[in-house]
Amino acid sequence: MLQTTLKYRNRCNICVREYKCCIGSFMSRFGLSNMALTHYLTSIIHSFTSLAHQMLKRTNQDLPTPVKYYNPEIAKEYKKIEAAAEQKLLSMLPEEFQEDFRPFVISQQTSEEEAQIVKQADSICAYLKCLEELSAGNHEFALAKKRLDITLAERKTPEMDYFLNTFAPSFELSLDEIS
């Protein structure tokens, strides 16, 4: 199915309909342009799991990590909210797709390896955001970058090293350096 969907650029990558399906209209309604960069970067690693992950973040208005994990009770309750949102997102798919996409949408059914890949991609996206902001002179992201340096070191893999060494430096370039 993935090979078939790649040739339809103006269509939903999930069901190959012209953005009139539940996911296509959902993405349009909640701001595809706001999530396009993050989704693209995350989808380099794993497209379907990252799509569900980003959709849930968008619909739940993802909490900043320090807030989400400050108190274990907050984290526990937020997991319940995420689980309910996952079920809602899955139910929005046409019935004929639900079983196929269940492992990609319902985090409890995602393999440990896929969950780790999504966490890595999410950390990389946050790190790249910090690089962009710091490059633009916004020093409010300095502490977040320090925390993410630690997180990235903990989640380090050869693939992450390659991505960070090859692509991350470009996120620190100024507009003049890019042109």
UniProtKB/Swiss-Prot annotation:
It comes from the Bacteria. The keyword Electron transport does not apply. Its cofactor is a divalent metal cation. One of its GO terms (cellular component) is cytoplasm. The keyword Metal-binding applies. Its EC number is 3.1.3.89. Pfam families: YfbR-like. One of its GO terms (molecular function) is 5'-deoxynucleotidase activity. Substrate binds at residues 62-65, 122. A divalent metal cation binds at residues 53, 122. Keywords: Cytoplasm, Hydrolase, Metal-binding, Nucleotide-binding. It is an enzyme of class 3 (hydrolase). Homodimer. Catalyzes the strictly specific dephosphorylation of 2'-deoxyribonucleoside 5'-monophosphates. Belongs to the 5DNU family. This is 5'-deoxynucleotidase VV1_0013.
